[in-house]
A protein has these predicted regions:
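Alpha-helical transmembrane segments of multi-pass membrane proteins
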Residues: 59-61, 127-151
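Membrane-interface helix-loop junctions in multi-pass transport and translocation proteins
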Residues: 4, 116-118, 131, 175-210, ...
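Short membrane-interface helical motifs at transmembrane helix boundaries
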Residues: 107-134
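Hydrophobic faces of transmembrane alpha-helices in multi-pass small-molecule transporters and flippases
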Residues: 11-37, 41, 62, 66, ...
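Single conserved hydrophobic/aromatic residue that forms the stacking wall/gate
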Residues: 1-10
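Small-residue-rich hydrophobic transmembrane alpha-helices
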Residues: 50-116, 148-171
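Short runs within selected transmembrane alpha-helices of multi-pass transporters and secretion channels
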Residues: 68-71, 140-160, 166-178, 182, ...
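Helix-terminus/linker motif at the lipid-water interface of multi-pass membrane proteins
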Residues: 29-62, 80, 118-127, 185-189
Length: 227
């Protein structure tokens, strides 16, 4: 009888773990498929555009390290507070760490922009590739501090509270309808260069920011429970 009771407890725990892990895995898998779709379209732009885009992605990843770290830490902090039933404290940390992430993002973007051109020279890029890469870096430096933080950092807190299905649906829809579809349309039908990928990405970030802000303020995500 005791073994059966422990088995039921373990089953409930495993089902709760899977209820978080499976949507997160699906979200990440769809994201990788989306990246492949974009890269296949980028390959039609020529080697100079591909080289410019490759370095722009590296620089964009570099300026997002600090904020991404804040988001990951938020998942841990928020998970502990919501798990202990301290909902208001969890909301406080979501807001506070989102602001910290925004400040870190602004500083990181400015620093990356300052060292961007020297890195391009060190990479030995051709003039045309350097021009395209610099244009993309300027666009990223302007758009990312405005759009990224609200679209990603609060989502970590919502996932920690158990609102994983909503996050998965939003992420997949914005990924495919904004980032992928818009980029492919601009490149294949409007003749845009690699900047089209970033226009699609900015649209993705902006719509995510609006949706997750509305979701957070509505309080519906607090109706979800992990334990």
């Amino acid at each position: 009888e005791r073994a059966r009771g422990l088995g039921d407890v373990y089953k409930r725990q495993i089902s709760k773990i899977l209820s978080i892990g499976i949507p997160a895995g699906v979200e990440n898998g769809m994201f990788q498929f989306g990246k492949l779709a974009i890269q296949s379209t980028e390959s039609t732009l020529g080697t100079q555009a591909i080289a410019a885009q490759a370095l722009a992605i590296v620089l964009e990843n570099l300026n997002g390290i600090a904020s991404m770290g804040v988001g990951i830490s938020l998942m841990t902090v928020a998970g502990q507070t919501f798990g202990a039933g301290r909902t208001e404290e969890g909301k406080y940390y979501i807001v506070k760490l989102t602001w910290y992430g925004e400040i870190g993002l602004i500083l990181s973007c400015l620093l990356t922009f300052a060292v961007g051109r020297p890195i391009m020279y060190l990479a030995g890029m051709e003039p045309e590739s350097m021009r395209m890469c610099y244009e993309m870096l300027v666009a990223i430096t302007i758009a990312k501090p405005l759009l990224w933080a609200l679209g990603f950092i609060p989502a970590y807190g919502l996932r920690a509270a158990g609102d994983v299905k909503f996050s998965m649906i939003v992420s997949i829809c914005t990924m495919w309808f904004c980032r992928v579809a818009l980029a492919i349309y601009l490149i294949r039908f409007q003749g845009f260069g690699p900047i089209a990928v970033w226009i699609g990405m900015f649209a993705d970030w902006g719509i995510r920011s609006i949706i997750f802000s509305i979701r957070f303020m509505s309080g519906k995500w607090m109706e979800k429970h992990v334990i």
